[in-house]
Amino acid sequence: MEDLRNVIRDIPDFPKKGIVFKDITTLLADAKSFHRMVDLIAHRYIGQKIDQIVGVEARGFILGAALAYKLGTGITLVRKPGKLPYKTIQKTYQLEYGTDTLEIHSDAFKPGDRVVVADDLLATGGTVAAVAELVKECGAEIVECAFLAELEFLKGRERLPLDRVFSLLKF
C-alpha cells in the first residue's frame, strides 16, 4: 500500500492555514495507481451480492463509478441540493462551522438492495453519517462504506452509525 500512499500529494495550508490537504488527484492521474486502487477495493466485494454503489459528491463519484463498473452494478449519486432532477429526500447535517445538506432520489433503491457507499476520504464522518441515513431511509442495506483514505486522527469512524467501514489507506 505504500506505493499508493506515496502517490498522494500533501498540500500544506489548504484550504486554510494549519490544514494539510491530502490531494488524491495525483493518484487519479496515474493510471497504474488508479487501477490498483480500484482493484484492491473492488476485490473486497467480489462474490458478495451488491446491488448498487452509492457515490458521494463529488470525488466519491470517481471511486463509485469505477467500483460499479468493476463489480457490474449501477451507481446511485448523493448530491448537494438542487442537482438531482427527480423527487428527492434530504438530510441536513452539522459541519465544524455550520450545516450542509445532501439529497438522493427517493426511488434510488428497491427494498432490501445491498449497497456499498464510496467516497474518497473519511475525515470527521459527518458527510457519510448523513449518507447512511439517506440510504437507510430509502430502504437499502449498507454492506460497507469504502474509502480510498482515512484521516484517523479525526476519529470519523466513531461518528458513523455502522461498524462496516473500510479504508484502503490510513493517515
From Swiss-Prot:
For this protein, the record's InterPro entries field holds: Ade_phspho_trans (IPR005764), PRibTrfase_dom (IPR000836), PRTase-like (IPR029057), UPRTase/APRTase (IPR050054)
Catalytic activity annotation: AMP + diphosphate = 5-phospho-alpha-D-ribose 1-diphosphate + adenine
One annotated GO biological process: adenine salvage
Q: Which GO terms describe its molecular function?
A: adenine binding; adenine phosphoribosyltransferase activity; AMP binding
Q: Which UniProt keywords apply?
A: Cytoplasm, Glycosyltransferase, Purine salvage, Transferase
**Under which EC number(s) is this enzyme classified?**
2.4.2.7
Fetch the Pfam families from UniProt: Pribosyltran
Q: Name one GO cellular component term.
A: cytoplasm
> Out of the domains of life, which is the source?
Bacteria
**Primary subcellular site in the record, as a coarse category:** cytoplasm
HAMAP family xrefs: Aden_phosphoribosyltr (MF_00004)
Annotated function: Catalyzes a salvage reaction resulting in the formation of AMP, that is energically less costly than de novo synthesis.
How is this protein named in the record? Adenine phosphoribosyltransferase
Species assigned in the record: Syntrophotalea carbinolica (strain DSM 2380 / NBRC 103641 / GraBd1)
